[in-house]
UniProtKB/Swiss-Prot annotation:
Record's protein name: Uncharacterized N-acetyltransferase YlbP
Gene this protein is translated from: ylbP
Membrane-traversing stretches: none
Organism whose genome encodes this protein: Bacillus subtilis (strain 168)
Domain of life: Bacteria
InterPro entries reported for this sequence: Acyl_CoA_acyltransferase, GNAT_dom, YlbP
Length: 160
C-alpha cells in the first residue's frame, strides 16, 4: 500500500523539490511556493507526497477553497484545488499519481484541477470531467472537476 504523507515545510523538503525541477517543467515547479512558506517544521503544509524509501518520488499541492468566491460546483460549496501533481521519471506508471488523487478524493469534497502535459487520459481514468468554459472564471485554463457523487454513478466493473 502506498502511503501519502503531508510534506513538512523545511529545507529538507526544499532539497527534494529541487529534484523535481531538474526533470519537470517550470509551470510544475513548487520551489518558489515552498520557499515562500518555509517557516517552521510543524507549519501546516499544502504539500503532499509519496516516498520510495527515503526519496520523494511523487508530490502534489492541495488547497481548500471557499466555493462562494469561485463557483465550479452546485450550491457554491467548498472544494479542493489539486495542483502540480508530478511523479519523477523512473517512478511513473507505478500507481503513485493515482494514490495521490485517491488521497485527495478521500476527503469526500469536490476537486478542481488544471491538467498539464498531455495528462487528459490519466484524469479521465480518475473520473474527472471537463466543465463548460467560462472566460471570467477560468482565465485561460481548462479545468477538470470531480465530485464524490461522480464515483457513485459509475457502472459496475469500471474502476476509478
Amino acid at each position: 500500500m502506498t502511503k501519502v504523507e503531508r510534506l513538512l515545510i523545511n529545507y529538507k523538503t526544499l532539497e527534494e523539490f529541487k529534484k523535481f525541477k531538474e526533470y519537470g517543467i517550470q509551470e510544475l515547479s513548487m520551489l518558489e511556493e515552498l520557499q515562500d512558506n518555509i517557516i517552521e517544521n510543524d507549519s501546516t503544509s499544502p504539500f503532499y507526497g509519496i516516498y520510495f524509501g527515503d526519496k520523494l518520488v511523487a508530490r502534489m499541492s492541495l488547497y481548500q477553497v471557499n466555493g462562494k468566491s469561485n463557483p465550479y460546483f452546485d450550491n457554491r460549496q467548498d472544494y479542493l484545488e489539486l495542483w502540480k501533481l508530478e511523479v519523477l521519471p523512473g517512478y511513473q506508471n507505478r500507481g503513485y499519481g493515482r494514490a495521490l488523487v485517491e488521497f485527495a478524493k478521500s476527503f469526500k469534497m469536490p476537486i478542481r484541477t488544471n491538467p498539464r502535459m498531455k495528462s487528459a487520459e490519466f484524469w479521465n481514468k480518475m473520473n474527472f470531467k471537463t466543465v463548460k468554459y467560462d472566460m471570467a472564471r477560468d482565465k485561460g485554463e481548462n479545468p477538470l472537476i470531480w465530485h464524490p457523487d461522480m464515483d457513485r454513478e459509475m457502472t459496475p466493473g469500471e474502476s476509478a
